[in-house]
């Protein structure tokens, strides 16, 4: 799996440079507009979009066909993509944290706001990536021809689910004075569990297809 991760990060080197440039421009704009509280959200949200680049590169390089002759199982490739998603998300969180530290120290950004936006962004990115990988490895392979559309749809679904759950929390607990941080941490924990469940399902499905 280490070799597969190295391959993907090597293939992503140009895309990562371009993404970092976009981030710098985006961050500069947010600072100029005095919207520093959004800084933790942006890097982690963009991190999952790199999955499209990776899978596109695999498809165009005929990597899936090369795997037939390589000493690798398809299930290993699937497992590696889920690990890659988590690594990309963690990298996005770290970048958001590094960028936010000066504003937290100066008092421009509240620590509570930083934690809240970080957890919210990670929840959306992780759910989006999980939905995207589930589409890719569990359903019609013709969907691989529409990766960009799948990526956009998975973002929309992620935001719709998380925002809906957030607004349902006051009704469920009978209060409108619930904690945003606690709400987002609970949502993140549920999404993390969903991520591992679909990881297992995707790997098992591909293991069964290899045995047939």
Which ranges hold each PLM region?
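Short extracytoplasmic
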Residues: 63-67
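Hydrophobic alpha-helical transmembrane segments of membrane proteins
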Residues: 1-62, 80-212
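Short helix-to-coil transition segments within interhelical loops
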Residues: 68-74
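Alpha-helix N-cap/helix-start motif at helix boundaries, enriched for small hydrophobics
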Residues: 76-78
């Amino acid at each position: 799996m280490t070799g597969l991760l190295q391959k993907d990060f090597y293939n992503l080197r140009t895309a990562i440079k371009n993404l970092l440039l976009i981030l710098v421009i985006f961050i500069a704009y947010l600072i100029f507009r005095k919207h520093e509280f959004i800084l933790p959200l942006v890097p982690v949200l963009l991190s999952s979009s790199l999955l499209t680049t990776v899978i596109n590169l695999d498809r165009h390089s005929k990597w899936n066909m090369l795997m037939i002759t390589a000493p690798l199982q398809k299930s290993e490739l699937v497992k590696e993509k889920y690990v890659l998603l988590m690594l990309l998300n963690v990298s996005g969180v770290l970048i958001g944290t590094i960028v936010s530290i000066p504003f937290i120290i100066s008092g421009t950004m509240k620590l509570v706001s930083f934690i809240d936006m970080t957890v919210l962004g990670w929840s959306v990115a992780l759910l989006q990536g999980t939905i995207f990988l589930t589409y890719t490895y569990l359903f019609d392979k013709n969907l691989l021809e529409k990766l960009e559309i799948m990526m956009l749809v998975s973002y929309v679904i992620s935001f719709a689910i998380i925002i809906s759950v957030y607004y349902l929390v006051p009704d469920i607990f009978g209060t409108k004075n619930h904690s945003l941080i606690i709400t987002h941490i609970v949502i993140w924990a549920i999404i993390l569990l969903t991520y591992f469940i679909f990881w297992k399902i995707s790997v098992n499905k591909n293991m069964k297809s290899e045995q047939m």
